[in-house]
Amino acid sequence: MKHQVQHKLLSIRRKRKQINEQPELREIIADPIQSDEFWKDLFLVRPLENVEKGKALQLAWKVFCEFESPDYAPEGTEEFKKCLNDDAYLAGIRYYGAFDEEKLVGMLGIWEEKRHVCFFFVDGEYQRLGIGKLFKRMREDFSGRTITLNSSPCGLPFYKALGFTTTDSEQTVNGIRFTPMAYK
């Protein structure tokens, strides 16, 4: 197992070195679809067990505070924190995780009944490394059905690259800025 971990770390380091030495690769990995091929087999993507949901929500909060919260009014940050601790809000969500060995590095949550993605967060060290595979896995499970989400301002280019389209203009509700989107 130790050898596998070292091999995987070397693989990730090699890929990062390749990117630094070949700037044209940046365009490939900026595209979530093409980056899947580049980073394939480095991350395990699977549905989360009930006991793993707490870690997923902790990851969501950590990443939100690091990347999203600075663009929100305090009201928006408090609203998001409230959602993470609200059992009624969290009911009916199916969670998926991306793992680097045993470490949860990405999470996606979708309300099954509404087919609405309510969470998608990736640890900062792992962003732009193909964790968008979570969407591929989720789309397989919900194939043939429209999936919706509310994108943060910084997430719009990513979701558009995955094939989501905007369905309305940007809105702010309880301090949370978002643009409604759908994937058909």
Give a label for each model feature:
Residues P153-F178:
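Conserved active-site alpha-helix within GNAT-family acetyltransferase domains
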Residues L84-G97, H116:
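A short helix-loop-beta-strand connector motif used in the catalytic cores of GNAT acetyltransferases and
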Residues F120-Q127:
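A short, internal acetyl-CoA/4′-phosphopantetheine-binding micro-motif in the GNAT/acyltransferase core
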Residues R94-G106:
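Conserved beta-hairpin
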Residues L57, W61-N85:
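Conserved GNAT-fold acetyl-CoA-binding loop/helix
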